[in-house]
């Protein structure tokens, strides 16, 4: 590992762009959330639960990337959950949409400039673990990055974070305990697992899924990993939650479709919302 001195050439302008976006958002509301959520495919309905919501289309936020994926509303919603101020992204952008890794993580860097201290990253994922079934909610314990890219490659901007961020506990153990505790109280059958990130947009082959299982993956998806890297780079604590919307290729023999993702997301909506409502106040206490 090289210990060359960090350089701020990396994103000449990226820090300023993130700061400008954060300033714009702050001008739209008096809310100053310290918790942010990225709501994945079929999971955006949680933001509709926010009290006193202020909705800002991504298109109005300076430099903010635009969602093109089906089912991603493309707006930032600020409001309160049980009195806790939060910001929720209804939809994210992905590498498969043609965005660069830096564009994919730009919203996370905006959150950092807004003063966010914890981010909840949610996604729809394929179940690799044969003990899972469609509709299962899984707290991410760790990840395997096979996306072939990393948003931290290039000269480092020390204003975002250190050159070599540690990923030993990328997914916060305390936050994962909050999820486990909430699951018991709510009588939800929750899991913990390892998420494997790919670029997409095609679904995986059965042979790939078999190999991922031998690597120790429990879940597979096309998002989240870059956001985790950027969040930890910025010192933001991370909770990752996957909704298993389908069993991965080769498990059932059925073809995979995007429609299935949204159908299952709608089916687990109430459990998903109840879980987040139970966890958010505890995260707020932990970062106070």
Locate the predicted segments by residue.
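Metabolite-binding pocket within alpha/beta catalytic cores that recognizes anionic/polar moieties
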Residues: 2-5, 9-167
């Amino acid at each position: 590992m090289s210990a060359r001195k960090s350089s701020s050439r990396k994103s000449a302008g990226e820090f300023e762009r993130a700061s400008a976006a954060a300033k714009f958002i702050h001008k739209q509301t008096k809310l100053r959330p310290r918790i942010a959520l990225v709501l994945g495919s079929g999971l955006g309905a949680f933001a509709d639960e926010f009290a006193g919501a202020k909705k800002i289309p991504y298109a109005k936020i300076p430099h903010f990337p635009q969602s093109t994926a089906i089912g991603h509303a493309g707006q930032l919603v600020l409001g309160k959950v049980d009195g806790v101020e939060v910001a929720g992204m209804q939809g994210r952008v992905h590498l498969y949409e043609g965005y660069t890794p830096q564009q994919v993580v730009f919203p996370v860097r905006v959150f950092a400039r807004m003063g966010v201290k914890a981010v909840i990253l949610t996604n729809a994922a394929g179940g690799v673990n044969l003990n899972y079934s469609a509709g299962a909610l899984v707290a991410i314990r760790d990840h395997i990055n096979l996306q072939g890219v990393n948003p931290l490659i290039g000269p480092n901007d020390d204003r975002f974070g250190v050159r070599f961020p540690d990923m030993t506990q990328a997914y916060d153990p305390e936050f994962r305990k909050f999820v486990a505790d909430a699951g018991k109280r709510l009588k939800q059958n929750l899991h913990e697992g390892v998420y494997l990130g790919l670029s997409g947009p095609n679904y995986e082959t059965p042979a790939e899924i078999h190999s991922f299982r031998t690597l120790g993956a429990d879940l597979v998806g096309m998002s989240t990993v870059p956001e985790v890297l950027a969040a930890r780079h910025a010192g933001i604590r991370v909770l990752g939650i996957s909704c298993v919307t389908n069993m991965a290729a080769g498990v059932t023999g059925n073809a995979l479709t995007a429609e299935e993702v949204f159908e299952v997301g709608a089916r687990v909506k109430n459990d998903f919302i109840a879980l987040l409502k139970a966890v958010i106040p505890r995260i707020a206490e932990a970062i106070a």
